[in-house]
A protein has these predicted regions:
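A positional/architectural concept
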Residues: 8, 12-57, 61-66
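Glycine-rich hexapeptide-repeat left-handed beta-helix
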Residues: 1-13, 46, 54, 60-62, ...
Length: 190
């Protein structure tokens, strides 16, 4: 068994995407520029599509799976953190899904939101943009747009993925990384 025949699988993965050797990708998957798929991550798209935007990171042990009627869609500059599950749901741009959180079929997480570690967003739930969600079942506990902070986190993971692609596992230390962070924080257009 093992990996399916590549000729029968539709994958559109940008050439700049870093995928850990232990990650497993099955089915119709699109991944945008600068994204990363970390160790032991599994993406399965048997009957619907998985679409992952640009500069998004799927961290260690993440599971992305489609529902029977629902694709899994993750926007640009998102962080889906360790052991989180996105199952047939939509995560809009600039979101962070916390460690061990679960987002179920038909749910929509609005732009710039955070789903707290361990939260469960149940089927069909619509979370407004700029929300913090916590609990089981997940409920909005705070309204604040975290798009800027979430985007910075995604940029940091982009930096780390570039280093891993070169075989460097200590990318977040030293002056070069600090310069990268400072440059990212400079006001635009000045």
């Amino acid at each position: 068994m093992g990996q399916p025949d590549a000729s029968r699988v539709l994958k559109q993965i940008h050439e700049s995407v870093w995928i850990a050797p232990s990650a497993e990708l099955y089915g119709a998957i699109t991944i945008g520029e600068g994204s990363s798929v970390w160790p032991q991550c599994v993406i399965r798209a048997e009957c619907q599509q998985v679409r992952i935007g640009s500069h998004t990171n799927l961290q260690d042990f993440v599971m992305i799976h489609v529902g029977y009627d629902d694709p899994a869609t993750i926007g640009d500059f998102c962080s889906i953190t360790h052991r989180a599950v996105v199952h047939g749901a939509t995560v809009e741009d600039d979101c962070l899904i916390g460690i061990g959180a679960i987002v179920m079929d038909g749910a929509v997480i609005g732009r710039g939101s955070i789903v707290a570690p361990g939260a469960v967003v149940t089927e069909g739930t619509r979370i407004p943009a700029g929300s913090v969600v916590a609990g089981v079942p997940g409920r909005v506990i705070k309204s604040r747009d975290y798009a800027t902070e979430n985007r910075e986190n995604a940029w940091n993971y982009w930096w780390n993925a570039q280093a891993y692609a070169r075989g460097e596992q200590r990318a977040w230390e030293g002056p070069e990384f600090r310069r990268f962070q400072e440059k990212r924080r400079e006001p635009r257009g000045s």
